[in-house]
Every structure is written in structure tokens, then in C-alpha cells.
Amino acid sequence: MTKWFAYILLASVCLLLSCGGKSVREKFAEADRLVNENNLDSAAWLLEEQITLSALSDSDKAEYGRRLAWLHLLQGRSLVNDSLIDYSVDYYKEHASEPLLSAYFVKAIYMGDSRKGLEQRRALYREAIDSAYSRSDSTYLVRFYDRLTSLSFGEGLYRETIAESKEWEEIGRAHV
């Protein structure tokens, strides 16, 4: 009798523990809602304190990295510690996932905050432009060309800036 009671008690505890929390996707949706309502601190608390990174699947880890870096960007926080965005970009490239372009955008900003080399940043923008072009995403094409030409101009690379601007103009004509 005691043995059966112990089994029933153990099964009940396991059942209660498994039903207790929200799924990671529900937490992501809740964080999105909080961001849309401009409750950035609450969204940060949810992502940073309520999600255990080591328990996430690969796809959830990529999504977590992209969302957290984007949130830090919206909060005006330094992105120096958001190296998980590298994982997100690599995962989305490997799986040809939809969030790739937004992950590129956040990674480019992260690279600027971490003072990565100029050529690394230019190469990232080139890669992002190619990806946006292959997806026919004119919004991200404009964003990435704008960032690339601004970076080149800011570094005094005037010939490159002119060449990139002409390339941007040609692509614009092709999409019209």
C-alpha cells in the first residue's frame, strides 16, 4: 500500500511540474507583446530571467539571441555582450529561415558596438545585401545599402561609396 502511495505521489508531482510554466514560444510571444506596448524593461526581465538558455532547442536559441539583441538595441543598451546574435545569423543561414535579414541587421549594429574590423563589417553588409537581393526584399536592401554606404563614407572610402551608390541605384532600377 505504501509503495502505491509513493508512486501516485511521485506521478502527481511530475504532472504538476510539467504543467506549471509557459512554453518558450509563449514567452517569446509575451515578450513581443510587451515590446509592442513599450514595456521594454518587462520584456527584458522576461527574456533574461525567465528563459534558461541551456534548455533551449537550436531554433529557440537562435530566436532568443535575435530577440534579446533587438530588445537591447531598442533599450539603447550596449550590444557588446550580445554575441549570441552570431549564433542566430549562422543558424538562420544554415536553415534558410525567414528571420535571417533582421538577424543580419542586428548583427551589423552589434559589430559596430564591438568595434569589429572595417572589412568584417563591410563583408557582413555585402552578405546581407546578397541575401536580401535573393529574397527580393527591397526594405532590407535599402537598409543594408544605406548602412554600407554610410560606413564607407564615414571611413573616407569615397571611391567605394560612389561604386556602392551606383550599384544600389542599378538594383533600384531593376526592382522598379
Named regions from a protein language model:
Residues 1-6:
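Positively charged n-region of N-terminal signal peptides that target proteins for export
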Residues 7-16:
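Bacterial N-terminal signal peptides
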Residues 19-173:
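A "functional boundary" signal
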